[in-house]
Amino acid sequence: MRECISVHVGQAGVQIGNACWELFCLEHGIQADGTFDAQASKINDDDSFTTFFSETGNGKHVPRAVMIDLEPTVVDEVRAGTYRQLFHPEQLITGKEDAANNYARGHYTVGKESIDLVLDRIRKLTDACSGLQGFLIFHSFGGGTGSGFTSLLMERLSLDYGKKSKLEFAIYPAPQVSTAVVEPYNSILTTHTTLEHSDCAFMVDNEAIYDICRRNLDIERPTYTNLNRLISQIVSSITASLRFDGALNVDLTEFQTNLVPYPRIHFPLVTYAPIISAEKAYHEQLSVAEITSSCFEPNSQMVKCDPRHGKYMACCMLYRGDVVPKDVNVAIAAIKTKRTIQFVDWCPTGFKVGINYQPPTVVPGGDLAKVQRAVCMLSNTTAIAEAWARLDHKFDLMYAKRAFVHWYVGEGMEEGEFSEAREDLAALEKDYEEVGTDSFEEENEGEEF
């Protein structure tokens, strides 16, 4: 079996984890106490779901996951929530004091106390796997635990499980809405530290998701629950091919092979369609062609940036539900004829397709409509560099005045780490710029000298 272990770090990671496991349980017909739902037993003809759940002797299914936070309140909600019997108590790990939005606390002082315990618990999970495929790590860039502790954990996972792939689902600080003033610092420090350890990072921007909730789902004031349920649909689509059998299945390593042209350029843009409320879905027929073309609309994206200004390097379309390859080919051919979508000239074809026959499941009482088919597009585009540029700019404004830096230095960090991280991100922006330039232009430049 090809097992995946999910690691949920910090408040964002744990709350997204709640939404994801709730959805996974519904999709696989597993009840809140981990037993099979008698009515839903027909869903699980295949046992692919064991990539995400392990089965105990008495027929209980336990998620292969750990939830970690340096302060207890968020994980306590899981311990007392509907799914408290689903998780093994040792899978829920909490510290006593939080990282206080401070990368240095998560990475150096407070994080150091918990890291060995966490790795020990992860080791127990990996020992129960017959063929571990890799780790999915959920966290935010802006928080102290999400940024600091995650980067520490990634470094240690690289040491212990060198060749196993590590995919991140990261919550990127929104351009307008901010939960902490020091988000730019934390984000840049964590990106710098995890850049060499992460194989692929799917970024999700809260503001983009707020907008989707307002615009497509008619929720006036979206809560984190609304956001997380939408994010969990995306995570479910990306991991569906690992949990169900399908016509064109996609493996974790296959994502990287098809999406990451250079090791550092591993931040695909995620788009999901159809995102539609139940009232609207009742009156619309969402064909394969329609959902495919709406994937290329900037307002279905999970990060605010404009791919019409960038170039695509690779594109992965993951369909689920009532979809046949013929429709997909027609839809993609139609996309290719549109001139708005530019591919880099060194990667002419660039579409990888996965089809999974399990239709999307929705959480009862949730916001999304039950639809017959859905698509999740992962595209590696140079436009995502806009997101880095925005963050870097905010970082520069604060760092020029050395604002808030003493909090980091006070926790044992050196000031040099800030400039080192900033230079690394400047290099990342440059990498994106160079990847997007046409190869024939470079050949001409060489002749002038």
UniProtKB/Swiss-Prot annotation:
This is Tubulin alpha-8 chain. Belongs to the tubulin family. Some glutamate residues at the C-terminus are polyglutamylated, resulting in polyglutamate chains on the gamma-carboxyl group. Polyglutamylation plays a key role in microtubule severing by spastin (SPAST). SPAST preferentially recognizes and acts on microtubules decorated with short polyglutamate tails: severing activity by SPAST increases as the number of glutamates per tubulin rises from one to eight, but decreases beyond this glutamylation threshold. Glutamylation is also involved in cilia motility. Keywords: Cytoplasm, Cytoskeleton, GTP-binding, Hydrolase, Magnesium, Metal-binding, Microtubule, Nucleotide-binding. Preferentially expressed in heart, skeletal muscle and testis. Expressed at low levels in the developing brain. Expressed in megakaryocytes and platelets. One of its GO terms (cellular component) is microtubule cytoskeleton. Pfam families: Tubulin, Tubulin_C. This tubulin does not have a C-terminal tyrosine; however, its C-terminal phenylalanine residue can be cleaved. Its main location: cytoplasm. It is an enzyme of class 3 (hydrolase). Tubulin is the major constituent of microtubules, a cylinder consisting of laterally associated linear protofilaments composed of alpha- and beta-tubulin heterodimers. Microtubules grow by the addition of GTP-tubulin dimers to the microtubule end, where a stabilizing cap forms. Below the cap, tubulin dimers are in GDP-bound state, owing to GTPase activity of alpha-tubulin. Mg(2+) binds at E71. It catalyses: GTP + H2O = GDP + phosphate + H(+). GO terms for molecular function: GTP binding; hydrolase activity; metal ion binding; structural constituent of cytoskeleton. PANTHER family: TUBULIN (PTHR11588). Its EC number is 3.6.5.-. Changing R214C: In MACTHC2; uncertain significance. It comes from Homo sapiens. SUPFAM superfamilies: Tubulin C-terminal domain-like (SSF55307), Tubulin nucleotide-binding domain-like (SSF52490). It is linked to Macrothrombocytopenia, isolated, 2, autosomal dominant: A congenital blood disorder characterized by increased platelet size and decreased number of circulating platelets. Affected individuals usually are asymptomatic and do not have increased bleeding episodes. The MREC motif may be critical for tubulin autoregulation. Its cofactor is Mg(2+).
